[in-house]
């Protein structure tokens, strides 16, 4: 059964001029994102024939609603006790077009590790603000754990990119500790309490980047406003995942960032684990910084 959490009852944005502005601005960016994904789709490698990709709708905790996901499965992998990796795409919490951008990452994991990879979707802001996205991610984890006849529940891992990494770490706090054995977080926004959180300027002081995207501060402000309602306490750990309770963090983890906007947010999570974690957590976590790379360099 889903673990109900107090923040789950928080209401949506109120319908007012501010919300109307958010919707219009976000939809404008969504249109640009769909165009960008269409024009650059040929640059992203397709999965090879040695991994099958299927589509699935799995049940959410909300009656009558389902969540979409792509499942990557190596050809020849036998049914029963299959290890599982769950991936959560980046989106700025608001852009649906980026679902599927991690397809080659998912393919490589499935191929090399001989595991099932579930690339899950989630609800987007501002129509579905905090905490609905992370609830969908936790529902995916719970759905996997409801199938012990199919999956090896002792080998379930999790990853996320950007906003998806934030949602992944938030979801860790909504499930029973130990359900996830390892986490990979790529440049997660982690501290909404910082005065710079909505501007995206907490970065390592690099100016030149080889690849990736340098997001403008006003775009960060928009995504933050769309995702976080005004009444939400920014210090709640399911939003500011830097403060995730240590007991909810797996013993193994990898935190990855380029030298752009999310560098400090990422390295501070790692530093906190090294400071407060158990001996197993301290030994099992790593930080990987990629010099001269911007946001979404991968």
Functional labels for PLM-detected ranges:
Residues 1-3:
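Short, low-complexity, Lys/Arg-enriched N-terminal segments of secretory-pathway carbohydrate enzymes
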Residues 8-15, 54-298:
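Alpha/beta-hydrolase superfamily serine-hydrolase fold, recognizing
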Residues 12-59:
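An N-terminal hydrophobic leader/cap segment in hydrolases
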């Amino acid at each position: 059964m889903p673990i109900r959490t107090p923040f789950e009852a928080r209401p949506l944005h109120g319908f007012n001029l501010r919300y109307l502005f958010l919707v219009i601005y976000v939809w404008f960016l969504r249109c640009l994102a769909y165009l960008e994904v269409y024009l650059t789709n040929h640059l992203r490698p397709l999965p090879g024939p040695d991994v099958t990709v299927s589509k699935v709708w799995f049940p959410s905790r909300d009656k009558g609603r389902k969540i979409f996901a792509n499942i990557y499965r190596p050809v020849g992998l036998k049914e029963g006790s299959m290890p599982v990796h769950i991936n959560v795409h980046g989106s700025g919490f608001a852009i649906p077009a980026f679902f599927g951008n991690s397809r080659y990452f998912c393919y490589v994991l499935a191929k090399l590790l001989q595991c099932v990879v579930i690339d899950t979707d989630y609800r987007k802001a501002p129509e579905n603000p905090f905490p609905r996205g992370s609830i969908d991610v936790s529902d995916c984890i719970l759905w996997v754990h409801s199938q012990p006849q199919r999956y090896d529940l002792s080998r379930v891992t999790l990853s996320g990119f950007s906003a998806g990494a934030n949602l992944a770490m938030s979801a860790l706090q909504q499930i029973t500790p130990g359900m996830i054995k390892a986490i990979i977080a790529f440049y997660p926004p982690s501290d909404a309490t910082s005065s710079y959180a909505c501007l995206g300027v907490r970065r390592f002081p690099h100016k030149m980047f080889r690849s990736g995207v340098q997001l403008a501060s006003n775009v960060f402000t928009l995504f933050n406003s769309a995702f976080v309602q005004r009444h939400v306490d920014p210090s709640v750990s399911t939003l500011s995942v830097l403060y995730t309770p240590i007991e909810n963090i797996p013993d193994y983890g990898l935190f990855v960032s380029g030298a752009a906007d999310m560098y400090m947010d990422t390295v501070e999570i790692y530093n906190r684990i090294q400071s407060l974690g158990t001996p197993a957590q301290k030994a099992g976590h790593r930080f990987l910084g990629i010099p001269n790379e911007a946001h979404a360099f991968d």
